[in-house]
């Protein structure tokens, strides 16, 4: 299949509509019947605020996260419409890819 690999970058403690962004995105992805999502937790990062974000022994809410998915063009359009209509502000990257299963 042809489509996109989308990566959303955020930090663990950030919320949107009273939910953690990761959970909000996963809920929307399920509603749109997108087949899967992978969440990666990173040790350290910094973004547009130029602050270092990292996981700490006592505090994990500042830990950087990436939410990754592979979607068709139609799914991509629907997902970004949901994001726009809810006014979620989140960094993303989107690349054209071929994806599927080996057998």
Show where each model-derived region lies.
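Positively charged, small/polar-rich N-terminal and surface patches that mediate targeting and assembly
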Residues: 1-103
